[in-house]
A protein has these predicted regions:
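Extended hydrophobic leader/signal-anchor segments used for secretion and membrane insertion
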Residues: 1-117
């Protein structure tokens, strides 16, 4: 039986999965990008890419923090115009890098190419 992302993060401290959807294009591509997520251990910063789960639907969402609020984050997909207020407790992880299928190489969120994005 496959583990949930939360179980993977609790067990290993990180998880890998392929993205689905176009909300983070042009950075991440539908079914072509594989992201590396680490368990959230500290408050997120502006421009971090947060993984959160919407309690009403159980859907996982990977979007960028555009503003840090007191007990929440204002979050938006790179390819979206609407923003969502996400309570701190919904956030389960943060993207630390990704693999692009075409390039077949790892790009860290700390690297110059990512930082210039």
């Amino acid at each position: 039986m496959r583990r949930t992302i939360e179980e993977e993060l609790a067990l290993n401290g990180h998880s890998f999965f392929q993205t689905v959807g176009d909300s983070m294009e042009p950075l991440l591509h539908n079914r072509e990008s594989t992201v590396v997520i680490e368990a959230k251990r500290a408050p997120l910063k502006r421009y971090d890419v947060a993984l959160y789960r919407r309690p009403a639907t159980g859907a996982y969402v990977l979007h960028r923090v555009v503003k840090v609020l007191d007990d929440a984050y204002l979050i938006c997909g790179d390819n979206r115009i609407w923003r969502e207020t996400v309570p701190n407790e919904w956030v389960i992880g943060v993207m630390t890098g990704y693999y692009e299928k075409e390039q077949d190489k790892y790009i860290s969120c700390e690297s110059a190419p990512y930082q210039s994005y």
